[in-house]
Every structure is written in structure tokens, then in C-alpha cells.
UniProtKB/Swiss-Prot annotation:
Record-listed 2-[(2R,5Z)-2-carboxy-4-methylthiazol-5(2H)-ylidene]ethyl phosphate binding positions: T139, P140, S141, G171, I191, S192
Cofactor note: Binds 1 Mg(2+) ion per subunit.
GO MF annotation: an example: magnesium ion binding
Protein's job: Condenses 4-methyl-5-(beta-hydroxyethyl)thiazole monophosphate (THZ-P) and 2-methyl-4-amino-5-hydroxymethyl pyrimidine pyrophosphate (HMP-PP) to form thiamine monophosphate (TMP).
Gene name tied to this protein: thiE
Entries under CDD domains matching the protein: TMP_TenI
Lineage: Bacteria, Bacillati, Bacillota, Bacilli, Bacillales
A biological process term (GO) from this entry: thiamine diphosphate biosynthetic process
Catalytic activity: 2-[(2R,5Z)-2-carboxy-4-methylthiazol-5(2H)-ylidene]ethyl phosphate + 4-amino-2-methyl-5-(diphosphooxymethyl)pyrimidine + 2 H(+) = thiamine phosphate + CO2 + diphosphate; 2-(2-carboxy-4-methylthiazol-5-yl)ethyl phosphate + 4-amino-2-methyl-5-(diphosphooxymethyl)pyrimidine + 2 H(+) = thiamine phosphate + CO2 + diphosphate; 4-methyl-5-(2-phosphooxyethyl)-thiazole + 4-amino-2-methyl-5-(diphosphooxymethyl)pyrimidine + H(+) = thiamine phosphate + diphosphate
Species in which this protein is naturally found: Staphylococcus aureus (strain NCTC 8325 / PS 47)
GO cellular component: cytoplasm
Name of the protein in question: Thiamine-phosphate synthase
Binding site for Mg(2+): D76, D95
Residues given in the record as 4-amino-2-methyl-5-(diphosphooxymethyl)pyrimidine binding sites: Q40, F41, R42, E43, K44, N75, S113, K142
Keywords: Magnesium, Metal-binding, Thiamine biosynthesis, Transferase
């Protein structure tokens, strides 16, 4: 069952997102201990794990999340999400159609990326629990990212559909969260702000402060 508070501090990570001196397990556990509210396993890039290696890692990270009662979401990979019985899946505009995914994930969390008004207009949100809007700011984590849309896009979507849960993504750090919250976002999703933080506990707690009012 989806709760929009899951979106508050939403951590996204894969093996290519962590510094060389740390493992993804260490980074995720530190983030979980600090209080992230949702985790998305996003294994992308030239060095991304595939096949059984990816499956094994996904199961290990899922187990970690469940020890802390944090939902485990898979990015894009429908077959992996089904195989490990993930808590949900997040897809982009070019990935599998949401309607088809909903057949397999009737009681799971489904998230959809939307970058602009055109994508919003052509998206079927019937089975979608939340949308990921961005990139809000320029981001180094996604080489194929769209032009930054700014917090204003969140405000626009909230005006169009006040009940739709929205998580912001793209270039977010502890210094630029305030305009996102003011625009009406239910949470922020970050990659490098947490994965490359020198003090993950401090970073996560600063993010949490924006949503604990």
C-alpha cells in the first residue's frame, strides 16, 4: 500500500553511483539508518551489473531495506521486479507501458517519470501512485536527462492535479530543497547527494527536516 510520505527522502542508487572506497551495501545501510523513506535500485551505465549478478545484488539490497521497513523499488526492470517480488517499480516515458505493468503489480507501488507538460498530457496516470518530476536542476547523475524544469514545474502539476503525489528529482542537494518544498512536492529523490556524501547521516537528516513540519 502506497503512502505519500514514502516520497519524503527517496534514495536512488546503483553500483556506479557510489565512491570507489565504499560498497553500495555500506552506503545504503548508512542511508537506511539515517532514515531514508524509500529506496530505488537503479543499475545503469557501462559498468552496470547484469543477469545473475544484478539479481543477487538486488536481493541483498532488498533484504537490507526490509530490515529497516523501507520499501524497495526497482527502476525499469519489470522482470527483476517480478522475480524478487519488489515493493514497486519506477518507469520512464520510454519504458514499459504503465497499463501493462499494472497487470503484474496490482498491489505494488508504481512511479512514472514526467519531465514536462507534453509528457504529462500523454501519460495515463490511472495506475500511477506518484510521478517523478525533473530534472529540477542540472544533474551529473543522468547523462540523458532533459533540460532542467525548475521547481515551477512542480507547482504547475500540483495546480493541475492537487491530489497527485509528486517527488522531485535532478540536481537536488540540501541547499536547494526549500523552493521544491514551497512548490508543493511531497518529497525529493536524490542519487549523488547521498551516495557521495561525506556524512550520510547528516545529509539525510537535513533532507528530513524539510518534511517533518
Amino acid at each position: 500500500m502506497f503512502n505519500q510520505s514514502y516520497l519524503n527522502v527517496y534514495f536512488i542508487c546503483g553500483t556506479s553511483d557510489v565512491p570507489s572506497h565504499r560498497t553500495i551495501h555500506e552506503v545504503l545501510e548508512a542511508a537506511l539508518k539515517a532514515g531514508i523513506t524509500l529506496f530505488q535500485f537503479r543499475e545503469k551505465g557501462e559498468s552496470a551489473l547484469k543477469g545473475n549478478d544484478k539479481l543477487v545484488l538486488a536481493k541483498e539490497l532488498q533484504h537490507l531495506c526490509h530490515q529497516y521497513d523501507v520499501p524497495f523499488i526497482v527502476n525499469d526492470d519489470v522482470s527483476l521486479a517480478k522475480e524478487i517480488n519488489a515493493d514497486g517499480i519506477h518507469v520512464g516515458q520510454d519504458d514499459a507501458k504503465v497499463k501493462e505493468i499494472a497487470q503484474y503489480f496490482t498491489d505494488k507501488i508504481i512511479g512514472l517519470s514526467i519531465s514536462d507538460l507534453d509528457e504529462y498530457a500523454k501519460s495515463d496516470l490511472t495506475h500511477v501512485d506518484y510521478i517523478g518530476v525533473g530534472p529540477i536542476y542540472p544533474t551529473p547523475s543522468k547523462h540523458d536527462a532533459h533540460i532542467p524544469v525548475g521547481p515551477e514545474m512542480i507547482a504547475t502539476f500540483k495546480e493541475m492535479n492537487p491530489q497527485l503525489p509528486i517527488v522531485a528529482i535532478g540536481g537536488i542537494n540540501t541547499n536547494n530543497v526549500a523552493p521544491i518544498v514551497e512548490a508543493g512536492a511531497n518529497g525529493i529523490s536524490v542519487i549523488s547527494a547521498i551516495s557521495k556524501s561525506e556524512n550520510i547521516e547528516k545529509t539525510v537528516n537535513r533532507f528530513k527536516d524539510f518534511f517533518n513540519n
